[in-house]
């Protein structure tokens, strides 16, 4: 009989703190075993991310998503909204982890041990996997929102403050998914 206990660790990361539009999306992942190629999602091409996301979903012991919508970001601020989204991802896991590691310097309030690791998305495979899943999901959502709100270019810049996005914002004004608490959206509304 095997008496060795397996400690279940969930990695958590977010995507979408900086954009002017769209939700902040988080993922929590518990891996069964290491997956080759995992790293910070920003270091991967879209094709690499998509292929790894498929493998993560197939091979992970468990994964779940969390999010904070634009209204929550504007009401709470991005820091607190991100921590809320992280908590939601962990709470949505079908398996309760023994501990949680989070990319960054802050941890969400959880009823289980949680540790923040700066640059964890490059150092901890579970956080890397969460980074990839969150990035792929948010990018897919922004492509879909581009069809609902044409003219802003969400499919290309994913809501970030690119020159194209800022120009569209000046021309069209903000739409429902713009973060009213963010400059230049707030500046435009106040004029």
From Swiss-Prot:
CDD domains: RNase_HII_bacteria_HII_like (cd07182). GO terms for biological process: DNA replication, removal of RNA primer; mismatch repair. One of its GO terms (molecular function) is RNA-DNA hybrid ribonuclease activity. It comes from the Bacteria. One of its GO terms (cellular component) is cytoplasm. The keyword Membrane does not apply. Residues 7-191 form the RNase H type-2 domain. Endonuclease that specifically degrades the RNA of RNA-DNA hybrids. This is Ribonuclease HII. It comes from Legionella pneumophila (strain Corby). The lineage of its organism: Bacteria, Pseudomonadati, Pseudomonadota, Gammaproteobacteria, Legionellales.
């Amino acid at each position: 009989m095997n008496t060795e206990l397996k400690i279940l660790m969930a990695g958590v990361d977010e995507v979408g703190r900086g954009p002017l539009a769209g939700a902040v999306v988080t993922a929590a992942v518990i891996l069964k075993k290491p997956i080759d190629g995992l790293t910070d999602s920003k270091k991967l091409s879209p094709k690499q991310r998509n292929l790894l996301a498929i493998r993560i979903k197939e091979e992970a012991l468990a994964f779940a998503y969390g999010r904070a919508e634009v209204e929550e970001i504007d009401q709470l601020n991005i820091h607190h909204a991100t921590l809320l989204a992280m908590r939601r991802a962990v709470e949505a896991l079908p398996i309760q982890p023994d501990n949680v590691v989070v990319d960054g310097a802050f941890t969400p309030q959880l009823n289980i041990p949680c540790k923040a690791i700066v640059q964890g998305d490059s150092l901890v495979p579970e956080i890397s996997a969460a980074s990839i899943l969150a990035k792929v999901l948010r990018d897919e959502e922004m492509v879909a929102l581009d069809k609902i709100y044409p003219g802003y270019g969400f499919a290309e810049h994913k809501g970030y403050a690119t020159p194209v996005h800022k120009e569209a914002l000046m021309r069209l004004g903000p739409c429902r998914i713009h973060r009213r608490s963010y400059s230049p959206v707030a500046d435009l509304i106040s004029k």
